[in-house]
Amino acid sequence: MPWIQLRINTNSDDAETISDLLMEEGSVSITFEDGKDTPIFEPKLGETPLWRDTVVVALFDAETDLTPTIAMLKTLPFLGENFSHKVEQIEDKDWVREWMDNFHPIQFGTRLWICPSWREIPDPTAVNVILDPGLAFGTGTHPTTALCLEWLDSLDLSNEEVIDFGCGSGILAVAALKLGAKNVTGIDIDYQAIDASRANAERNDVADKLALYLPEDQPADLKADVLVANILAGPLRELAPLIAERVKTGGKLALSGLLKEQAQEISDFYSQWFDMDAAVHKEDWSRLTGKRK
């Protein structure tokens, strides 16, 4: 069945109001898009901000007459008579199939592949992690995840104990186990992340070697040979003493979730406890590594 799509250029202050009005007008779906490719890298705790320039996209049944809706929108003082909008017909598709077609196996380093479950594994002899996009982020496509996966692939993790701080989907924890780690402890503040990590570990037959905790439940004496933390600069700085305490003397550290301009400050801060290496960059993001003093 075809649909009618209405796109309205607005701003973050008015997007929610427009969304509510369009739902009252019979829209079956509302989404928000970035109007000017402006990333939001580190929102304040508890906030889910919109982009300053926001596009409200509404879907209506193909038989809907949008003339009254457009007329109503023109009366809104924050839009006005000549507000920027576009109406177009959208042909129905197998959207699930279209979404699935966008995900392909990705190689990281020399040994490691991340493969969606519906794709054929390119190299059965490689280290293959089966992972589908889901509620908890982290499928290898983001530069910070890729940087961490490449680092893990470069290590000899045989019989090493690993901590994944901010485990999200569990992609780094599962990858470490598939690469030979003795065991991994995953820590995250989100129950959904804990559940997703457990499910992905079970899918990859490594759940028996993965322990998962909320921060308040982690063992007080927890230590590891390798710690990877793919979170944001603020939490990395705040948690630095705890992260340092969790790494054994001579152990390895990787930090990501950092913008290029944040890397030097975080590296300098962690140098209290670690001999830090030069930052590695991918697009706008950075990875820091170091060895525990």
Curated annotation (Swiss-Prot):
Annotated TM spans: none
Residues at which S-adenosyl-L-methionine binds: 145, 166, 188, 230
GO terms, molecular function: protein-lysine N-methyltransferase activity
SUPFAM superfamilies: S-adenosyl-L-methionine-dependent methyltransferases
GO cellular component: cytosol
Lineage top rank: taxon: Bacteria
Keywords: Cytoplasm, Methyltransferase, S-adenosyl-L-methionine, Transferase
Compartments where located: Cytoplasm
CDD domains xrefs: AdoMet_MTases
Transferase as UniProt keyword: yes
This enzyme's EC code(s): 2.1.1.-
Catalytic activity: L-lysyl-[protein] + 3 S-adenosyl-L-methionine = N(6),N(6),N(6)-trimethyl-L-lysyl-[protein] + 3 S-adenosyl-L-homocysteine + 3 H(+)
Record-level GO BP terms: methylation
Described function: Methylates ribosomal protein L11.
Family the UniProt entry places it in: Belongs to the methyltransferase superfamily. PrmA family.
HAMAP family: Methyltr_PrmA
Name of the protein in question: Ribosomal protein L11 methyltransferase
Gene: prmA
